[in-house]
Amino acid sequence: MRARFAPVLFALALWLVCVLPASGVAAEDPRRAATAQVDEAFAYHVGTLGYLYGFTAVDLLQQRYKETHRVSAAQQTLAPVNRLFRFRELLTPATVGALRAPNADTLYLSGWFDLRQEPIVIRAPDTVGRYYTLAITDFDGEVQHVGRRTTGTAKRDFVLVGPDFVGKLPAGLTPVRVATHDAWVLGRVLVSDAADLSAAVKVVDGFDTLTLGEWRRGVRASMPTSEPDGSLPLSSPWTPMVSLDFFATLNRWLREQPRRREDAALLAQFDAAGFGPAVTFDETRLSEGTRRGLLRAMEEARATLRAASLRPIADVRNGWFFPLALGRYGYDHLMRATVAFGGYANLPEETIYAALTADSKGELLRGDRVYRLRFPAGARPPVGAFWSLSAYRLADFSFMPNAAAIYSVGDHKPEFRTAPDGSFAIRIAREPPTSAEREAGENWLPVGEGPYSLVLRLYEPGGAVLDGRYKPPVLETVTP
């Protein structure tokens, strides 16, 4: 009996050894696939939110690194961290560098500041009424201003105070509280024309920065403060906007920044996806599903930002778009990232950037056409400081090169013309107005090849601009 069943038992044992493990593997495959699917989906959705949430900070970190370190032979190093760089010429297409949609009316100051160790003092000279503003941007993109509109033009010492500072500030300093440990300061000083440039340069050179300790001692350290070793980049080559370096950079930044209590639930999701402030992002330990999800998230988020930047603005006046939701974003992470995606801007109380890209028929503005803006007597833009009009190539919002090397027009310039009744016009074309047209109050903004956008800058805009009552004139097409 035992012998009869031995082959059967042997066959059963062989089946248990050979078949069941195979069945086990087959049973595990759906589970493994499900895990990968969940990992990818979760990383994709949370990663998309994370990219939008952190885009501004990572973009500013990248910009800071490029301007404070020599990253290539062709890269201009502006100044070390905690020091100012001064642009002593008005910007042109040849000198604008990476600055997006710059103006051609002011000299720029730029500085990147690390407030972890101690506050930083910015000394502003007496500008004797000359317009200036310093836009102080934290790394969430929130903006504050000091300057003519807010603090006047007399000599003053401002102090940038980070979120962790505890202590009493000395008398004689005007504090500016910054919500992140890092800040970017972009200053503007008005220039009327070439004859005014040397006086404006003296004003720009009058700005200076010191640590609070240097200010107290009255002595500047012999070596300027530079970015701490090993702070950035995290990999070589460092491509934080288009690779998983983004999440590594964001993770490192989040781990050291104070965050709002209201962001806790969102940050917990970032932790679960591997890049929040309570974890350390490690690309080598990501599951394949998580890796795929985060890479997809970056593509989706960038596509969203491209689309968001093309959305129509609700405030449209005679074809001009008035973007007023700039510089203060609260919990609108998409708006914050969209603005950073296209460039950074002043608060609307400081400057409004009204843009026009199409004529009255909805056709894009073109360099081979002639346009005109007519401002009746008494209808100058209502501003407390000045206004200017510039043209930018639609493809990249850079200045339109032109033979006359004129990149803005405005009534703060000595060559600006008005008619005897106070009215004026602006011809927007390759060719200038005739002498008779100039005498009749027609000014000229040259343009170059291809489609472009007009930007009307309004510095210290009046209440009628801010509340929607002011409308720029309709653009006339002179030659179709």
Where are these regions (language model features)?
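N-terminal secretory signal peptides that target proteins for export/translocation
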Residues: 1-6
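Bacterial N-terminal signal peptides
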Residues: 8-21
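Bacterial Sec-dependent signal peptides at the C-terminal "C-region" and cleavage site
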Residues: 18-30
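A compositional/structural signature for long, glycine/proline-rich flexible linkers
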Residues: 27-480
